[in-house]
Amino acid sequence: YLYSSIYPSKRDGMDRRECRAEVKESIEYDQLRTIYRFDELEEIVDLITDVLCSTRATIRIGGEDLPIEAVKDRFWRLEQSHIEYVLDRMKETTTKIRNIRGYLLTALYNAPTTINHHFQAEVQHDLYGKQH
């Protein structure tokens, strides 16, 4: 996976506090607070901020070491609906999660690419799944 830009981002010089503030704004934190617990959201914001402020070359996502810049690019695109999706899936899971940080990192990374398929499957189930 190649990172799509060779130019440094305007966010590269951002300190952790500024980064965290931008994350909260981009995921519409205040709106999410009306739905989810404070501690749940703080963990998510901290995790996203950790990734975006990382200086490592790679990060482990879903058992693979991916280039940090590719992961940062995906994490900068996270929005309120992605956070809702991840937190709601967490509540639905019945299996024991041994590495919660790894699970959340993978879920957040995949959220922008899987959210539409999830909702399409839900609609299909609601329309056709109850006939059996």
Regions found by a protein language model. Name each.
Residues 1-132:
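Electrostatic interaction modules used in gene-expression and signaling proteins
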